[in-house]
């Protein structure tokens, strides 16, 4: 987008150090052109690869490369390692549903035992858990460390029968679940000089074995200055599993025992522990680099100089001082920024600062805005910028004397000096063409093709808009909204409506030339709702009848967006299009699409094509929309393939939202759709936005993920940004960081309010820096890490084979944990898996990401659904991605009707269900109520008002309003869960042992997937094996 006339010189014109001075980076997966595997990163027959099924690798030199990803991220080609045994062949859905075995136990029998074997897992013994706190190391574990930890140990197991010697030939394992069902096996492994078996990656360069006395290879250089104190971590031990394990000298074989899932780290326990220690308290942001409560913990946040974690969460709150440390640890340095996050009513709203025509005070060199990180000197006449260290003169209007500690006397009176987040009123320098913007407009665009008329959708939309238009957002002090509204209907042609307030009847104008769309009227198209209410209601009453006899099935789509954008452009205002659409646009027009849903591409290198838009029309249309501040929100009602990858591109790139209701049925889906529409119309939103992330010297923002457009390396452009959208930003070093000054981040968003005022919203955050790797690991936040990994992987889906992306994710998980083990943990047996306390649930969350249908196809999931989920995750904040990948599972049968507390959640595994139980599962998109066959009759009566399990109607999507405590309590709990989520969750009732349970079971993410995807236990074993291989 051309910036001319968009933002004048003061705000964003001058470069700052470290911004825009290098070519763009491509995150952790690289752009399509970078596909060579960096040395030491990919191990085609690594620990999860085609090694001997029961064999062991001889100790040898370490992997050759220093780290897994180069400066521009990891790039890999060829076959990634095979990982887990694949599922049995699937003939049809019904037969793959394991029958329930009659059981005397109350526990819920699963189709796959939790001790289901892999080549490693089959030899695991039972684990016992031994916890030791920060002051106690386990016996023979070396010095105590500062971190609390959990140690999981296993008794010895039988020695492995064979050791892989040079030249040994072993058969590859069966096709793996990580590479998708049916993946072809890899070639036979062969001996390599670095001690790893398997074929070398293309272009790999080998290093000779180390000379006598030489240390481990560059992959894990020994730490001296930055080794830090020893830290205890969660430890799982698998004696004898790996080279160096004590079981090589073990006695007679011991009987195999089941691996106990209770002995591995539990996400539920981590969530509950944090709630117990920090829930309901005040969290003050006055300390640099402090780790906030988890997103799952409710607390009151008090801004005392750093932005609330509602606005910014980081993957780690302590950055490594050098890029070498960052490469060694492999922990992504990133922030998830949600600039318009909703602030609870018990917390202070953002203060608005108005400096009149002078505008915000900014650093002359780097253009950072005045904030708590600026240091005033020389009696208050000058200040030193915290970001670039430039010394600036204080403008005369802004001068104030300093107190005895060098702080301004008005420190606590000025939000920009004492708070982490605040807003400025922007001057004309920050406006397009240096003139104030007009208030935004909402345009409602309704597909009136045959199917939408016949199923009653058009009538429903028109009816509901009458009441919803009353709720169009307005400024708190205003009586009416400044937002204007307009209406268009379409099928193969476009119908514009004149609803000027002085008309007796609305007037329709038809545009048939969809190749060159124009706006046939200006005056009367965009109107104030209050003034034209009667004409608008008249129109909404007429539309369903107007098209009642239409037999037109073909629709256009791109011209609809074009028409809305041209209307906003003609009115010289930003705005939002609400498009209600239901079919593949097959009519002759720009953006015409064909059905390209090809299942043959699944599990091939061409699978990425399914996620790419079919034509470049939508990409250029999105750029035009952003250039004119036009955001697009799309409500899709498909009954078959509609190519979400193409249709959803404009909503994604313009800061809009995509909602999808498959096979829409009025009686089942009406409420979900209306809830979504109402929330979308009413939500807090900013228009025509540009975001810039500034950093202190030593590091810079290099990559951005979200519903955004970038025409250069620094400015994040968004036609609109609302309270649910987050942008994830990755940082890289460009120099050393100082422990004293830390790492400072300032996010500035320039936007237009719903009343047409131009503002700047500023968020500031200070992080610590350390030369000790231990500090970096102590300060990590797993929920933010998973948000980053998901977005970087889902972005890479457009350019790289999915199996390569899955491989990179497993590789990086192992690298992070191996670096911790080598440099931070107390000495321990090689057979123990040691996890940092802050990352002990990283493996389970990473496995959930790997099993998501975007990265691992499943036969029952459509191509459109995969494209839809990919798009949703790209704009999610940390709380939404946490719930999406690890759903909440609540035992409803344990409800205490006298308490307002939610029942304690249980782990997402079939083993946690019981025949006597009723469970509620929610992941932010779906909600299920699962009913065991022996559910208590009094609960069934209380919730459904029917006498028994057999009488329950599973078609209902809303619970009946039964006037008893159980029903009221359950509906209250569902309301609480729903209230915090951006999408309305339709309820599905699932009975144990009935067919719909197949869908429900896919959300039990700790279990093995029906069509691929490892169980949590198996994944943990495989990560451990890979860590051991890295360390050896």
Curated annotation (Swiss-Prot):
Q: Where are the Gelsolin-like repeats?
A: 901-974
Topology versus the membrane, per the UniProt entry? Peripheral membrane protein
Subunit and interaction comment: COPII is composed of at least five proteins: the Sec23/24 complex, the Sec13/31 complex and Sar1. Interacts with TMED2 and TMED10. Interacts with CNIH4. Interacts with GOSR2 (via IxM motif) and STX5 (via IxM motif); recruits GOSR2 and STX5 into COPII-coated vesicles. Interacts with KCNA3; this interaction is reduced in the presence of KCNE4.
Residue spans of biased composition, Pro residues class: 198-212
Q: Which segments carry the region annotation Zinc finger-like?
A: 363-388
Q: Coding gene?
A: SEC24D
Provide the family line: Belongs to the SEC23/SEC24 family. SEC24 subfamily.
| Name the UniProt record assigns to this protein | Protein transport protein Sec24D
Give the linked disease: Cole-Carpenter syndrome 2: A form of Cole-Carpenter syndrome, a disorder characterized by features of osteogenesis imperfecta such as bone deformities and severe bone fragility with frequent fractures, in association with craniosynostosis, ocular proptosis, hydrocephalus, growth failure and distinctive facial features. Craniofacial findings include marked frontal bossing, midface hypoplasia, and micrognathia. Despite the craniosynostosis and hydrocephalus, intellectual development is normal. CLCRP2 inheritance is autosomal recessive.
Tissue specificity field: Ubiquitously expressed, with higher amounts in placenta, pancreas, heart and liver.
| Binding residue positions for Zn(2+) | 363, 366, 385, 388
Q: What is the lineage of its organism?
A: Eukaryota, Metazoa, Chordata, Craniata, Vertebrata
């Amino acid at each position: 987008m051309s910036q001319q006339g968009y933002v004048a010189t003061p705000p964003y014109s001058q470069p700052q150090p470290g911004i825009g001075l290098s070519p763009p980076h491509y995150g952790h997966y690289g752009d399509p052109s970078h596909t060579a595997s960096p040395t030491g990163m990919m191990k085609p027959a690594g620990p999860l690869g085609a090694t001997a099924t029961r064999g062991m690798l001889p100790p040898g030199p370490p992997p050759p490369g220093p780290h897994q990803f180069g400066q521009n991220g990891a790039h890999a080609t060829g076959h990634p390692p095979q990982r887990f045994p694949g599922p049995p062949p699937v003939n049809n859905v019904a037969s793959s549903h394991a029958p329930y075995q009659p059981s005397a136990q109350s526990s819920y029998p699963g189709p796959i035992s939790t001790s289901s074997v892999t080549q490693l897992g089959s030899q695991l013994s039972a684990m016992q858990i031994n916890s030791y706190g920060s002051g106690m190391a386990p016996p023979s574990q070396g010095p105590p460390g500062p971190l609390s930890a959990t140690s999981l140990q296993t008794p010895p197991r039988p020695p492995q029968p064979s050791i892989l010697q040079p030249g040994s030939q072993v058969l590859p394992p069966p096709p793996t679940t990580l590479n998708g069902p049916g993946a072809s096996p890899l070639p036979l492994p062969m001996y390599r000089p670095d001690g790893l078996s398997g074929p070398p990656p293309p272009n790999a360069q080998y290093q000779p074995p180390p000379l006598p006395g030489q240390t481990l290879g560059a992959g894990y250089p020994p730490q001296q200055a930055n080794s830090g104190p020893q830290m205890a971590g969660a430890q799982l031990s698998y004696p004898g599993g790996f080279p160096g394990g004590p079981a090589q000298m073990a006695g007679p074989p011991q009987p195999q025992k089941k691996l106990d899932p209770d002995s591995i780290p539990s996400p539920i326990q981590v969530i509950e522990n944090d709630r117990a220690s920090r829930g309901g308290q005040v969290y003050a942001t006055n300390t640099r680099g402090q780790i906030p409560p988890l997103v799952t913990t409710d607390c009151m946040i008090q801004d005392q100089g750093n932005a609330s974690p509602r606005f910014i969460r980081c993957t780690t709150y302590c950055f490594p001082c050098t890029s070498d440390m960052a490469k060694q640890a492999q922990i992504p340095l990133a922030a998830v920024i949600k600039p318009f996050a909703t602030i609870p009513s018990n917390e202070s709203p953002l203060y608005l600062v108005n400096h009149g025509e002078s505008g915000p005070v900014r650093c002359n060199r780097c253009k950072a805005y005045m904030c708590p990180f600026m240091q005033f000197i020389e009696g208050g006449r000058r200040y030193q910028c915290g970001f670039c260290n430039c010394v600036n003169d204080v403008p005369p209007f802004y001068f104030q004397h300093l107190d005895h500690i060098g702080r301004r006397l008005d420190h606590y009176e000025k939000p920009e000096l004492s708070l982490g987040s605040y807003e400025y009123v922007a001057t004309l320098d920050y406006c397009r063409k240096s003139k104030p913007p007009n208030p935004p407009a909402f345009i409602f665009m309704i597909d009136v093709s045959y199917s939408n008329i016949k199923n009653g959708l058009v009538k429903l939309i028109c009816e509901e808009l009458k009441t919803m238009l009353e709720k169009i957002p307005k400024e708190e002090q205003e009586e009416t909204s400044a937002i204007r509204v307009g209406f268009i209907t379409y099928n193969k042609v476009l119908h514009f409506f004149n609803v000027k307030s002085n008309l007796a009847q609305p007037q329709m104008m038809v545009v048939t030339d969809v190749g060159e769309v124009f706006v046939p009227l200006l005056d009367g198209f965009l109107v104030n709702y209050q003034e034209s209410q009667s004409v608008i209601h008249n129109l909404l009453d007429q539309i369903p009848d107007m098209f009642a006899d239409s037999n037109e099935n073909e629709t256009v789509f791109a011209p609809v967006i074009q028409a809305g954008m041209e209307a906003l452009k003609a009115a010289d205002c930003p705005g939002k299009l609400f498009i209600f659409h239901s079919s593949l646009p097959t009519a002759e027009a720009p953006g015409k699409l064909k059905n390209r849903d090809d299942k043959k591409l699944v599990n091939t290198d061409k699978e990425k094509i399914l996620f790419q838009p079919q034509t470049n029309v939508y990409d250029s249309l999105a750029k035009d929309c952003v250039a004119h501040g036009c955001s697009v929100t799309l409500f899709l009602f498909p009954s078959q393939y509609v190519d979400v990858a193409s249709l959803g591109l404009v909503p994604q790139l313009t800061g809009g939202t995509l909602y999808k209701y498959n096979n829409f049925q009025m009686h089942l889906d009406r409420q979900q759709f209306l809830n979504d529409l109402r929330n979308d119309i009413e939500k807090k939103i900013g228009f025509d936005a540009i975001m810039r992330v500034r950093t202190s010297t030593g590091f810079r923002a290099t990559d951005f993920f979200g519903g955004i457009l970038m025409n250069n390396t620094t400015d994040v452009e968004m036609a609109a940004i609302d309270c649910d959208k987050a942008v994830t930003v990755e940082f890289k070093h460009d120099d050393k960081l100082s422990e004293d000054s830390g790492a400072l981040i300032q996010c500035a968003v320039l936007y237009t309010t719903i009343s047409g005022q131009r503002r700047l919203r500023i968020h500031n955050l200070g992080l610590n820096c350390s030369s000790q790797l231990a500090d970096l690991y102590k300060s990590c936040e797993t929920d933010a890490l998973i948000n980053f990994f998901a977005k970087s992987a889902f972005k890479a889906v457009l350019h790289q084979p999915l199996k390569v992306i899955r491989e990179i994710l497993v590789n990086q998980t192992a690298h992070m944990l191996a670096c911790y083990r080598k440099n931070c943990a107390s000495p321990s047996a090689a057979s123990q898996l040691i996890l940092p306390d802050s990352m002990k649930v990283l493996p389970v969350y990473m496995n959930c990401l790997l099993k998501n249908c975007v990265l691992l196809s499943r036969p029952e999931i459509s191509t459109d659904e995969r494209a839809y989920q990919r798009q949703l995750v790209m704009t999610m904040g940390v709380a939404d991605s946490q719930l999406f990948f690890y759903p909440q599972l609540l035992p409803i049968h344990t409800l205490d009707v006298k308490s307002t507390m939610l029942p304690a959640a249980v782990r997402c595994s079939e083993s946690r269900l019981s025949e006597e139980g009723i469970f509620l599962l929610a992941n932010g998109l779906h909600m299920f109520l699962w009913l065991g066959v022996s559910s208590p009759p009094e609960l069934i009566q209380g919730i459904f008002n029917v006498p028994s399990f057999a009488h329950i109607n599973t078609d209902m999507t809303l619970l009946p309003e039964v006037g008893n405590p159980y029903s009221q309590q359950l509906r209250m709990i569902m309301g609480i869960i729903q209230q915090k989520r951006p999408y309305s969750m339709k309820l599905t009732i699932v009975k144990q042992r009935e067919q719909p349970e197949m869908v429900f079971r896919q959300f039990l993410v700790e279990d093995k997937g029906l069509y691929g995807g490892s169980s949590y236990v198996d994944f943990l074993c495989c990560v451990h094996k890979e860590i051991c291989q890295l360390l050896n």
